Amino acid sequence: MEIIKRNGNVEQYDKKKIAVAIQKSFASVGTEIKVVLIDEMVGAVEQFIEAHSDMRNVESIQDQVEKTLMQNGFYDEAKSYILFRFQRTERRNAINSIVADAEDEDLKPILKKISSDYTSVEYSLLLLSDKFKSFCKDDMKQADKLSALVKAAVEMTTQEAPNWEFIAARLLSYKLNRSIAAFEESVSVHSFYDKLRYLTDERLYGEYILASYSPEEIAQAATFIKEERNDLLNYSGLDLLMKRYLIRTYSNKPIESIQEMYLGIALHLAINEKEDRMLWVQKFYDILSKLEVTMATPTLSNARKPFHQLSSCFIDTVPDSLEGIYRSLDNFAQVSKFGGGMGMYFGKVRAAGGKIRGFKGAAGGVIRWMKLVNDTAVAVDQLGMRQGAVAVYLDVWHKDLPEFLQLRTNNGDDRMKAHDIFPAVCYPDLFWKMAQEDINQPWHLFCPNEILSIKGYCLEDYYGEEWEKRYIDCVNDARLTRRTLSVKDIVRLVLRSAVETGTPFTFNRDHVNKANPNGHKGMIYCSNLCTEIAQNMSEIESVSTEVKTDDGDTVVVRASKPGDFVVCNLASLSLGHLPLENESELTDVVRTVVRALDNVIDINFYPLPYAKITNQRYRSLGLGVSGYHHALAVRGIKWESQEHLDFVDKVFETINRAAVEASSDIAKQKGSYKYFEGSDWQTGEYFTKRGYTSPEWTALAAKVKEQGMRNAYLLAIAPTSSTSIIAGTTAGTDPVMQRFFLEEKKGAMLPRVAPELSDRTFWVYKSAYHIEQQWTVRAAGVRQRHIDQAQSQNLYITNDFSMRQLLELYLLAWRSGVKTIYYVRSKSLEVEECESCAS
């Protein structure tokens, strides 16, 4: 028997559909029904159909189901069924109206899926249809009508109906894929291999992909694509991917789909795998496309492309010489050119009034060099997208500190300002001890070059008790000139700048160096632009300059020792999207991303040879997290609670253990990093310093000692300001600033909604500015035990915060073992995030 559908098509009669409809009508009112009774009513409907051949259409059959329910006395169920039919009719009418207004029949299945997935009344397509009509004009082109439809969905996103941002993303995804399909048709691209061949020929894709993978492997990789994972993206995330990360034509049209982007990145990350390469391609693709992991902005943007600079963070130790300073400026320019962020340690540079070649008072000090750093940041923009970004670090005992702390403030001599750099201060434990015990004690500022010339050592080359001993030695040496202020004066300058500008960043040098697993090979003087990296550093040293003849030409050859020019590759676990209670699954994701990050080291394009040398010596990683507040909220865990601290203690210990074991297992297969012997990893000190004494940790320590470690450094929590938007989660370890707000960008209002905002999570998402900051600092201290590097840890203060309250937060952070503090975010202050570290 054949049944006529509403669109005129014919399909075979299926009595299961009638049975399901009857069953749903009972379920909707909470009553049970026996299967025998359902069969009886289905039989009655079938008798009617067989007796009336002219009534064999969907509407007539549904009318008969209503009558059968009422004839059997099921009035509530019949009422529910009638309401269901009415809603389905409304839905069909809304879909047909949108399709007609958009002049696009292919929209119908997309709208049907949306209607099926979002059944609540606040997501009715009738509402979308009405909104769309207000935007849609008859003279619009079809593409503009699709844009208007997307805009309509975006503007319907509210605190009460947050999922419209996912509906808007589906419509935008359809528009994108429609545009890409038309482009592919125009250039005769019919497969993923064809696509890669075209992109390679256009020099939009790196030749190395097709040179390394066979056509059969590319075809196999294409089968990994799961287009339905586009539905995981919200509008803000998809919009950001389209604008910044997808490959575009030279006329600026996106020609790469979202899933093709993730697969292309996976192909690049797995390119050097010797065994099970396609398995690793699939595993890398899965963690990225499921939004379980986000790679840092440079990796996400540049992997698979001809110029594949994949690293986020670079740190240079600036020498105290004209040649060295200008080389560091050039290093910054080269890093910035390829989209990296920079940290620069100026603690070795002589202070203002210091000697130059014996002439007293000749040195201009670090502030003059700050102006050049500032101008370099402005002049050399990141891939033409935005100006360079650099944090400049100075020790709290440096003679130029008072002027340094006023670089970004609005008062004072503008010739002494550098508004486009981010100042940061390195503190020893002694400073915080004195601030805690008696803030009125004197604090002495010295010139590092003068200490070296008179005392024969560099004070900055020591930490802990040895530093304190030498600092007191300097204080007691009358030959050393100094500036003496009280600790209170220094603190006042720091806090005033922090409240006004958000900076200086904080680097607790003794905490960092005492926990350094590679202290046998160097010293950590400072951190990077976003304060999460802490690795061995040393300056580049000039060796010689020779004039030679090469093929009849005279050439000048400059030789230098590379030092430790820090570079780090970042990725983040999206905690809000991961099964954190399932240790096995979480461990598998961590192991996968550690392998991906280790591969980045070998496939990376380095803007400087010094960076390549250091990266291959240490093979350092920076695995962090995003979605921290998201993960707490969906579990109903309040930020200001012991439950929060206990939960993250367990989660971060699991992540750390998985990362250490993954690195050790890779070392067994591929070899350890160069300086493993003598490291805290090898001696076991890494584990004892952190109190890792359980049987699991003891066994892992023995395993590491036997197998080695592939990577010198593993964990670092970056801010993830951009990539957390892509993943539709909260940034880094920060709490949300607002549950819902509208952000104006290029004339459009974009909704920003806390992830999975609902009646259940609403009150758990407490604003960062309303959270007691002591809980934030305590949580950072709990996490720090499990993080071998550092964290981009922000503090959030309101306008009624006193200087004493802010100082207490700094002291609590120091007492809690927190290594670094990033911005102090005042409610009246807006600060600009670093894109490079936005992993």
Residue spans for each PLM region:
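Terminal amphipathic helices with adjacent charged low-complexity linkers/tails
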Residues: 74, 80-88, 164-196, 427, ...
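Polar, glycine-rich mid-to-C-terminal structural blocks
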Residues: 406, 419-494, 498-501
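Alpha-helix capping and helix-loop boundary segments enriched in small/acidic/polar residues
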Residues: 9-13, 33-36, 102, 253-256, ...
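Internal maturation/activation junctions in enzymes
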Residues: 287, 329, 589-612, 638-720, ...
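Core nucleic-acid recognition elements
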Residues: 9, 32, 36-263, 267, ...
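Catalytic alpha/beta core of large soluble enzyme barrels
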Residues: 217-220, 226, 230-241, 531-535, ...
